């Protein structure tokens, strides 16, 4: 019955019973902990005494003195504090700072000789070099370009150095040589420019050589040679070269003056005959004379006479401009020959249109039946068309004419195509060899031989 009653007890009552049991356990544990605290020694638990410290600080010192030795407090207050602070200030600061100062000086010194590594005297003046190194970078930044130009002029500086034999003075001169020669170089670079105008004045001296008219041809080349040797002389030598052809032009127009007073047509032929003679002279002469003579012709209007002269020569020489009409004649002759060969053939339909040709092949209704007709476009590159019948379809194959080789080929231009000397050869070849037929609509290929010739009624 007791078990049944316990089962039937509602859950709320069970929870209340559990809460009471937990509360009782906590109360019992609290009593046990209080008993343990009373049994403990007052000395060791320092933390609870600090939390509940109600006594004076004097009592606390007495408690520490009773539990622990007095030797632990004295070294912290007197001996250890003094001994720990003093050595840190004396030994640590003095011994650690000097070495980095020495290393910095060692790093600076090797960098200086690299800037002047080519000079040997700088090694003895390493101590004096650092102050100069600070002043040098300001100046060499911009004159570095001129200093490179100064490298070509060390001779004047070398002449000044032997004048001062003592070595300590050489060091001072080396330092001065790095700054002063920059100014000297500017002066030395300007002096040649000042000296250059006198040779410019000598240029007209070359013009005086033109006085002898016969030797003017020989004197003109040296002026050009001098212009090639020096870049400054080019602009000035070209100026005297221009007036030099003027006297030559004065001599040579004498010949056109003889031709100009005779403008009539019969004399024009004489003028044409006289032209090749100076042309041959120009070929034998130098190119420089050609350039001088070229400006002489336009005022005399000789090229006007030269233009009508070559016009009749072009058709004679067979130039490409005139070849067009001449090639048309051989084309017509070849077509006439082809027509003569094709007229007697049973498969040649002549000027038959496409519709009538296809109707004739459909009436025959035989695979391999064919005929050849003239192309409807009347194109010289595609003069004929081969019409073939196979599998109830009619194929129109163009016959191309190749002007370069004067041969014939079937279809569009392709690699490995066959060439024939005439249309008759095409028919004879494909009567024994199959002809490939391509249907562009269905993308199909067939082949047949030309077996049955068809006539158009």
From Swiss-Prot:
Look up the record and report any one GO term of the cellular component aspect: cytosol
Post-translation changes: Following BCR activation, phosphorylated on tyrosine residues by SYK and LYN. When phosphorylated, serves as a scaffold to assemble downstream targets of antigen activation, including PLCG1, VAV1, GRB2 and NCK1. Phosphorylation of Tyr-84, Tyr-178 and Tyr-189 facilitates PLCG1 binding. Phosphorylation of Tyr-72 facilitates VAV1 and NCK1 binding. Phosphorylation is required for both Ca(2+) and MAPK signaling pathways. Phosphorylation of Tyr-96 is required for the binding of BTK.
Read off the SMART domains from this record: SH2
Bias type Polar residues, positions: 207-218
Q: Does the keyword Acyltransferase apply?
A: no
Main localization (coarse): cytoplasm
Q: Could you name the domain of life of the organism this protein comes from? A: Eukaryota
One function term, GO molecular function aspect: protein tyrosine kinase binding
Tissue specificity here reads: Expressed in the spleen and weakly in thymus, no expression was seen in liver, testis, or brain. Expressed in B-cell lines representing different developmental stages from the pre-B to the plasma cell stage, but not in a T-cell or a fibroblast cell line.
Quaternary data: Associates with PLCG1, VAV1 and NCK1 in a B-cell antigen receptor-dependent fashion. Interacts with VAV3, PLCG2 and GRB2. Interacts through its SH2 domain with CD79A. Interacts (via SH2 domain) with SYK; phosphorylated and activated by SYK. Interacts (via SH2 domain) with SCIMP; this interaction is dependent on phosphorylation of SCIMP 'Tyr-120'.
The identity of this protein, by name, is B-cell linker protein
Q: Which organism is it from?
A: Mus musculus (Mouse)
């Amino acid at each position: 019955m007791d078990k049944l009653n316990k089962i039937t007890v509602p859950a709320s009552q069970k929870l209340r019973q559990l809460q009471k049991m937990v509360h009782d356990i906590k109360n019992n544990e609290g009593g046990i902990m209080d008993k343990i605290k009373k049994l403990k020694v007052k000395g060791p638990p320092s933390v609870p005494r600090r939390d509940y410290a109600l006594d004076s600080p004097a009592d606390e010192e007495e408690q520490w003195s009773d539990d622990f030795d007095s030797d632990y407090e004295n070294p912290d207050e007197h001996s250890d504090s003094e001994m720990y602070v003093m050595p840190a200030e004396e030994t640590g600061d003095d011994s650690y700072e000097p070495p980095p100062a020495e290393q910095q000086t060692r790093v600076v010194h090797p960098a200086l000789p690299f800037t002047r590594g080519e000079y040997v005297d700088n090694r003895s003046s390493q101590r004096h070099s650092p102050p100069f190194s600070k002043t040098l970078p300001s100046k060499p930044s911009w004159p570095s370009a001129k200093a490179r130009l100064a490298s070509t002029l060390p001779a004047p500086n070398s002449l000044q150095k032997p004048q001062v034999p003592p070595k300590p003075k050489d060091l001072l001169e080396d330092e001065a040589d790095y700054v002063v020669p920059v100014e000297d170089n500017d002066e030395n670079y300007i002096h040649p420019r000042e000296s250059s105008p006198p040779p410019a004045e000598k240029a007209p001296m070359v013009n005086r050589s033109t006085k002898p008219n016969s030797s003017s041809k020989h004197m003109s080349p040296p002026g050009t040679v001098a212009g090639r040797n020096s870049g400054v002389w080019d602009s000035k030598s070209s100026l005297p070269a221009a007036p030099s052809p003027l006297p030559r032009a004065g001599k040579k127009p004498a010949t056109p003056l003889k031709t100009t007073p005779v403008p009539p047509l019969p004399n024009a032929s004489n003028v044409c005959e006289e032209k090749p003679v100076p042309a041959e002279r120009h070929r034998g002469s130098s190119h420089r004379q050609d350039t001088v003579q070229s400006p002489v012709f336009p005022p005399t209007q000789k090229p006007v006479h030269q233009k009508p002269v070559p016009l009749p020569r072009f058709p004679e020489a067979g130039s490409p401009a005139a070849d067009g009409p001449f090639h048309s004649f051989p084309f017509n002759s070849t077509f006439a020959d082809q027509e003569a060969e094709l007229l007697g053939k049973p498969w040649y339909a002549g000027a038959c249109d496409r519709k009538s040709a296809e109707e004739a092949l459909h009436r025959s209704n035989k695979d391999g039946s064919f005929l050849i007709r003239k192309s409807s476009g009347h194109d010289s590159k595609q003069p004929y068309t081969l019409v073939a019948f196979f599998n109830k379809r009619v194929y129109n194959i163009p016959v191309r004419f190749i002007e370069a080789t004067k041969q014939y080929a079937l279809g569009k231009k392709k690699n490995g195509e066959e060439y024939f000397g005439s249309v008759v050869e095409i028919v004879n070849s494909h009567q024994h060899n199959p002809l490939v037929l391509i249907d562009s609509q269905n993308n199909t290929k067939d082949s047949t031989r030309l077996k049955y010739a068809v006539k158009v009624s």
